[in-house]
């Protein structure tokens, strides 16, 4: 199967999954990002999905448990490794959030204004991050990789 055909089938399966299950998992948003969204996956590429849970309805531990459950169900369904990013505006990961929110393909959106708001926040965060310069970004990345 050609990679573009495989990509379209994958997106269709993911959209069906999230349309059927988003409410059960208390999701407001699910986006495909990374190599599959960009159209440049390798045969062994994992599937990167960003999710945003309904605000104020579940705690951090329940979110982690739901991510494990979603991951297991998706991996069984699509026969690929799945990596899920929880979108949490309180955490600062501007590059990852920017990639997921701005370049991602919507799989499930309960409220388009929420997606718009999160995208605008990601763009502003990235602009702030970029304005500090490459040297600062490299230092920050180095600290992050060292676990500091």
Language-model segment annotations:
Residues 1-29, 38-39, 43, 60-148:
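Catalytic core of pol beta-like nucleotidyltransferases
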Residues 33-35:
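Glycine-rich beta-strand-to-loop/alpha-helix junction loops that act as flexible
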Residues 50-54:
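Short hydrophobic/aromatic beta-strand micro-patches
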Residues 57:
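Short acidic, S/G/P-rich loop/turn micro-motifs used as interaction or catalytic elements
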């Amino acid at each position: 199967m050609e990679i573009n055909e495989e990509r379209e089938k994958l997106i269709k399966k993911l959209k069906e999954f999230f349309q059927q299950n988003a409410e059960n998992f208390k999701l407001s948003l699910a986006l495909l990002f990374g190599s599959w969204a960009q159209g440049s996956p390798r045969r062994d590429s994992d599937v990167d999905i960003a999710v945003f849970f309904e605000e104020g309805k579940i705690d951090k531990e329940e979110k982690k448990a739901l991510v494990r459950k979603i991951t297991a169900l998706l991996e069984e369904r699509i026969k690929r490794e799945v990596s899920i990013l929880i979108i949490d505006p309180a955490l600062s990961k501007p590059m990852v959030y920017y990639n997921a929110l701005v370049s991602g393909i919507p799989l499930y959106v309960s409220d388009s204004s929420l997606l718009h708001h999160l995208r605008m926040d990601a763009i502003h965060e990235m602009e702030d991050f970029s304005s500090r310069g490459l040297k600062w970004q490299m230092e920050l990345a180095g600290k992050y990789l060292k676990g500091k």
